């Protein structure tokens, strides 16, 4: 959210918990939408409405599954869907007619692999992100800290989907 905002994007956050999504507004999101239908309206319809019918230019998708399916239907012509993961448990599958007809790209994003294959550009990217963080533009939100001997509880906390932002395990 913070990076998109810094780059001048109108950030539309999506998720399954309105309580958690409200926090994204503090981080700079312009809007937030629930990914499940609300009053019979899907989030793809809401994205289209918020973008004057055009759709999103870039979609950052760490979820996959149904969210990816809907994302393909609300991406703008020439847009990019960034596949960052599949926390839904269902790996995204794209019928190739969708990007052909709508003229969008699907890009797999693996920061570590990118840095390994192109170390110079990888370092440039890390340096740029670090600079933004050093300047105060990117501030990670840590919702809860656990001691090292509480690591099991930290994992349970994540599995129970209680976190908003990041969980930190600290060594004292």
Model-identified regions with their sequence ranges:
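Local beta-strand N-terminus motif with an aromatic residue
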Residues: 29, 55-56, 151
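Mid-domain Rossmann-like dinucleotide-binding core that forms the NAD(H)/NADP(H) cofactor-binding site
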Residues: 1-37
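Glycine-rich phosphate-binding loop and adjacent beta-alpha segment
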Residues: 7, 24, 66-137, 170-172
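N-terminal Rossmann-like NAD(P) cofactor-binding module of classical short-chain dehydrogenase/reductase
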Residues: 59-60, 82
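C-terminal capping/lid region of NAD(P)-dependent oxidoreductase domains
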Residues: 130-131, 135-144, 152-172
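Short amphipathic alpha-helix with an adjacent loop that forms part of the alpha/beta core around
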Residues: 40-53
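Glycine-rich beta-to-alpha transition loops that act as phosphate-gripper elements at the mouths
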Residues: 12-18, 60-65, 141, 145
């Amino acid at each position: 959210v913070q990076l998109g905002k810094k780059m001048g994007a109108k950030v539309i956050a999506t998720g399954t918990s309105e309580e958690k999504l409200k926090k994204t507004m503090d981080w700079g999101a312009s809007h937030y939408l629930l990914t499940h239908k609300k009053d019979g309206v899907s989030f793809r319809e809401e994205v289209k409405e918020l973008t004057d019918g055009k759709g999103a230019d870039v979609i950052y998708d760490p979820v996959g599954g149904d969210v990816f399916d809907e994302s393909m239907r609300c991406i703008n012509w020439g847009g990019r869907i960034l596949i960052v993961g599949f926390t839904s448990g269902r790996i995204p599958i794209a019928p190739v007619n969708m990007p052909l007809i709508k003229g969008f790209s699907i890009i797999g994003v693996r920061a570590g692999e990118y840095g390994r294959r192109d170390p110079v550009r990888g370092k440039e990217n890390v340096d740029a992100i670090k600079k933004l963080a050093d300047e105060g533009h990117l501030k990670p939100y840590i919702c809860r800290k656990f001691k090292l001997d509480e690591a099991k509880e930290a994992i349970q906390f994540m599995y129970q989907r209680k976190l908003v932002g990041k969980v930190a395990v600290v060594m004292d």
